Amino acid sequence: MNKKSICLAVGLCLLTSTWAQKKSFGRKMEPINFSQVEITDNFWKPRLETHANTTLGVCINQCEYTTNRVKNFAIAAGVIPGKFEGLVYDDSDLYKMIEGVAYSLTNHRNDLLENKIDTIISYIAKAQKEDGYLMTYYLLGDMSQRWTDMDKHEMYCCGHLIEAAIAYD
């Protein structure tokens, strides 16, 4: 290709891209909050209802009774006596459960679930140290070891806590 052809091709591209940017083909898209969306189809609606009415209750039961995830926070909050039991990253699973309930409550109000989550959140708030630190593995163990081993999932758990807090606005 010679220089004239290249210049002509570049000029044509610039001209058409400028025209396309100025030309509007329809309405501007406006974002909306998902709380303003109602799912009514035959595929997703029943699944979301099952999630709200069954799955979330099972998740809460798993965190509260099958594992010690809620209990660890109640112990760290001073509500009940005990010691840490479970996996080092168990806090994150509780936070993800809270996030799931929070998003579901946006479109499927359920006072029982909301009250249960509020109780769990009260344990979390009471367990948090004055400096903001919050991880039951260390709160109920050796606090001098916090932030010393990134394989212990402190940042991972913190990220899930933040996501849960955003969801449970």
Q: What residue spans do the PLM features occupy?
A:
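Bacterial Sec-dependent N-terminal signal peptides
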Residues: M1-K22
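Glycan-recognition and catalytic cores of secretory/periplasmic carbohydrate-active enzymes
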Residues: Q21-D169
